[in-house]
A protein has these predicted regions:
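Terminal, contiguous helix-loop blocks that mediate binding/assembly
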Residues: 2-261
Length: 261
């Protein structure tokens, strides 16, 4: 996993916050601190295996459809399926999705629709928790977006942004992951031509996505969790605007950041 993200392990899925008094539903992560891997290691393992490029990689985990992840995986998979926010511990509703996931050429639009329909009606211990986000990233479009982001970051007409006004996609404080579309549209407020190029490329990079009106997070909140409204949603996150110390201190290891700055 890129250094801007908390390292996740590759062990079996368990409910997070199991030792706390969380009353609301837990969200999904994997294992603990003993066995971990980075996205770069995962990528190298795929490359060294000689099995070729995957049709898709599905992440049944939190905060995995970020531009940083897509950049590192761009050469080992055609698509990435996952959630830009936390996902409930129930995870992907495989019974509903398997009909498409098992195909050589899945219908990604249907996968997103079925996922959102499931989580729009999700309940936990008899209470309604209608929260979910999903997106599909086309990795063949990552290089084009990276080249465009180089131009954007070098632009002399970038508008200032207020971090707290951006669409946060997590419960960290300060946030680590922001909606990429919201961030770039904010800084390109005074450059309509460059913004038009970005919007066009974003639509190619994230061809399918879905979201409920809010997302749910268990981080740094009360025992019932916390619901965050989604006012804008591009289906992909970026950590560039984050002032979180963990993000800022790891930029020298962030391959996407180094490629675009």
């Amino acid at each position: 996993k890129p250094s801007t993200r908390l390292t996740r392990s590759v062990a079996s899925p368990i409910e997070r916050d199991i030792e706390t008094d969380l009353v609301g539903p837990p969200t999904r992560w994997f294992g603990g601190g003993d066995y971990q891997t980075d996205i770069s290691t995962f990528t190298k393992g795929i490359e060294d295996s000689g099995i070729g490029k995957f049709q898709y990689i599905l992440f049944d985990d939190c905060n995995m459809t970020g531009i940083e992840v897509a950049y590192e995986l761009r050469n080992v998979t055609n698509h990435i399926i996952g959630s830009p926010t936390e996902i409930m511990a129930y995870g992907m509703p495989y019974k509903l999705l398997w009909g498409e996931l098992s195909k050589v050429n899945p219908d990604y639009h249907r996968i997103c629709n079925d996922f959102i329909n499931f989580y729009s009606n999700y309940t936990y211990k008899g209470s309604s928790y209608p929260y979910g986000t999903i997106s599909v990233i086309d990795c063949s479009q990552v290089e084009n977006m990276v080249n465009l982001m180089k131009d954007i970051n070098r632009s002399a007409s970038l508008s200032p942004f207020v971090e707290s006004n951006l669409q946060s996609m997590d419960g960290y404080n300060p946030s680590k992951f922001y909606d990429m579309g919201d961030y770039v549209r904010t800084i390109l407020h005074n450059d309509p031509l460059l913004l038009a190029r970005f919007n066009q490329q974003l639509n190619l990079l994230v061809p399918e996505k879905g979201n409920t009106s809010s997302y749910y997070t268990t981080f740094n909140k009360d025992s019932f969790g916390h619901v965050v409204p989604i006012r804008t949603y591009s289906g992909i996150t970026i950590s560039d605007p984050s002032s979180n110390p963990e993000v800022r201190q790891s930029l020298n290891k962030n391959l996407y950041y180094k490629a675009t700055h």
